[in-house]
Design a protein with these regions (language model features):
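Internal alpha-helical scaffold of NAD(P)-dependent oxidoreductase catalytic cores
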Residues: 1-76
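Glutamate identity and glutamate-enriched acidic tracts
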Residues: 17, 22, 34-37, 94-97, ...
């Protein structure tokens, strides 16, 4: 596991880093702004996308009957605790909007040019992110 420390004015973090390592985790130091931007990209926005994806197609009975592991896995975050989901959107909405803009830009970019080349690059980069046990190795 990775634990993000957001020290105030970058106080001495050695004791906390030592404790985190002793507990078997990896400490990462970031400013609150950096932390909020990052979690918007990898947690809050994906939850929002999962909610939107499910909501957009839930009324198509055939699609719901045919839905299997891909749809299940992609929409899992739609079941996030409701209070937590509202807090994410309320307290980190600006960063979620920035992530959404980047996402839409990427969607548009994928439609242009050599799609196979682009998804090959994406697939290769994504495969290098996790080891065989599913642990993020970056």
């Amino acid at each position: 596991a990775k634990w993000v420390m957001t020290p105030y004015d970058y106080d001495d973090t050695k004791i906390l880093e030592s404790l985190i390592k002793e507990l078997g985790a990896t400490p990462i130091v970031a400013s609150p702004k950096e932390h909020d931007e990052a979690v918007a990209m990898i947690s809050h926005f994906p939850m929002y996308v999962a909610q939107c994806l499910y909501s957009a197609f839930k009324d198509n009975q055939l699609a719901m009957k045919l839905a299997s592991s891909g749809f299940r896995d992609t929409t899992r975050l739609a079941m996030t605790d409701l209070t937590l989901a509202c807090d994410m959107l309320n307290f980190n909405g600006e960063n979620i909007e920035l992530a959404q803009e980047k996402f839409v830009q990427t969607l548009n970019d994928l439609k242009k040019g050599n799609y196979l080349e682009k998804i090959t690059e994406i697939s290769h980069a994504r495969r290098k992110m996790y080891n065989s046990e599913g642990k993020n190795i970056l």
